[in-house]
Amino acid sequence: GPYATIFKDQTAGAYQSPLSCIEEMIESGMWNIANEVGDAKIKDPYTKYTSGDKEGGLYAVESWYSWHSRDDYTNNIFSIRNTYYGRIDDNDVSKVDGNLSAFNSYKDFDDEGDIAEHSLSKLIASTNPDLDEEIKTLIFASAKAIQAIPQPFRNNIDSEESVAAMNTCMELANLLLNEVKPYVNQTFGDPEYDDDLDAIAEQFVDAVVLPTYKDLQEKNKLLLDAVNQFRQNPSNDNFEKACNLWITAREPWEKSEA
């Protein structure tokens, strides 16, 4: 059956309980992309570049040809935020024009009501507010550190800001895998929490996953139409429209990662 039904109802495959869904959200979603951003998307180019393979480092940068790497990586981190908060939020790079340095912490950045009642954040905060605080702090710190890399990333691979962003993302990844997942298993593994976990899984699917992919589908339809229009009527204007829509379509794609 469809993913939404399988995940919410735990009817087949790896999802045999509400807890298995929460584990999937933490490890396969949140940890996986935090680790990928820190250990691959930033570290791979950095390692190649600083070892002397400058061309290899350049070509290892994701989206280097569009100068969109920083926003792609930041949207990856915002996908973790959406998963943890149980809600898609409009506090993204376009809203603040990439100026995350204007915010001292997530407390300045977040709006009231950003965190859904049925969310991982609310659940963890109910028993361990310090851990919830650490997670929220590192999510925002990772996004802020990425945006602090001088633009474009391809020209600043070996900058101290790149190293800081890489390390912060890896700190977030380590927290999610080595502290958050074990804590959730130990604290909420009893069947008495099944209803709470099930509500979080449903909120995640209905308010994060499905809207993200709906947005992705709609924006890719517009992109395809623009590409076909350029193919049929080549012009600078039609080429620019297709390029801009490609950039627009990347946002929900990168925000789908967690």
PLM feature segments, named:
Residues 1-258:
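Mature extracytoplasmic or organellar-lumen-exposed domains after removal of signal/transit peptides
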